């Protein structure tokens, strides 16, 4: 049953990375938008 934990951990790590990348991109775009005003 070790493979279940391995797959779960891998998916969790990948999803965390994607969410972090999207959050950073959102913050950067927000800063860029404020500079234009």
From Swiss-Prot:
Q: What induces it?
A: Constitutively expressed during aerobic growth, induced in low oxygen, and maybe by SDS/EDTA (envelope stress) (at protein level).
Assign the protein's first listed, main location to one coarse class. Answer: membrane
| Localization annotation | Cell inner membrane
User: Which is a GO BP term held by this UniProt record?
Assistant: oxidative phosphorylation
Which reaction equations make up its catalytic activity? 2 a ubiquinol + O2(in) + 4 H(+)(in) = 2 a ubiquinone + 2 H2O(in) + 4 H(+)(out)
Recorded metabolic or biological pathway in which this protein acts: Energy metabolism; oxidative phosphorylation
Q: Decide whether keyword Transit peptide is in the record.
A: no
Following inactivation of the gene, the phenotype reported is: Slow growth in aerobic liquid culture, forms mixed colonies on aerobic solid media, increased sensitivity to reductant (beta-mercapoethanol). Reduced cytochrome bd-I oxidase activity.
Residue intervals passing through the bilayer:
4-24
Function, in words: Required for correct functioning of cytochrome bd-I oxidase. This protein and AppX may have some functional overlap.
The protein depicted here goes by the name Cytochrome bd-I ubiquinol oxidase subunit X
What organism does the record attribute this protein to? Escherichia coli (strain K12)
Lineage, top ranks = Bacteria, Pseudomonadati, Pseudomonadota, Gammaproteobacteria, Enterobacterales
- Identify the gene encoding this protein: cydX
């Amino acid at each position: 049953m070790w493979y279940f934990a391995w797959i779960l951990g891998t998916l969790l790590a990948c999803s965390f990375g994607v969410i972090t990348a999207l959050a950073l991109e959102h913050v950067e775009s927000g800063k860029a938008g404020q500079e234009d005003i």
